[in-house]
From Swiss-Prot:
GO terms for cellular component: cytochrome b6f complex; plasma membrane-derived thylakoid membrane. Keywords: Electron transport, Membrane, Photosynthesis, Thylakoid, Transmembrane, Transmembrane helix, Transport. GO terms for molecular function: electron transporter, transferring electrons within cytochrome b6/f complex of photosystem II activity. Its main location: membrane. It is found in: Cellular thylakoid membrane. The chain crosses the membrane at residues 5-25. Pfam families: PetG (PF02529). Belongs to the PetG family. It is a single-pass membrane protein. GO terms for biological process: cytochrome complex assembly; photosynthesis. The 4 large subunits of the cytochrome b6-f complex are cytochrome b6, subunit IV (17 kDa polypeptide, PetD), cytochrome f and the Rieske protein, while the 4 small subunits are PetG, PetL, PetM and PetN. The complex functions as a dimer. This is Cytochrome b6-f complex subunit 5. The keyword Membrane applies.
Length: 38
């Protein structure tokens, strides 16, 4: 049986990790476009 605390931590970290990767990819994509335009 999985501990509720561990399960809560995992469920809490997954959205944060996905959000962090999305923001990082967006910033890199935006930065790349700015460099290409210049």
């Amino acid at each position: 049986m999985i501990e509720p605390l561990l399960l809560g931590i995992v469920l809490g970290l997954i959205p944060i990790t996905l959000a962090g990767l999305f923001v990082a990819a967006y910033l890199q994509y935006k930065r790349g476009n700015q460099l290409n335009l210049e």
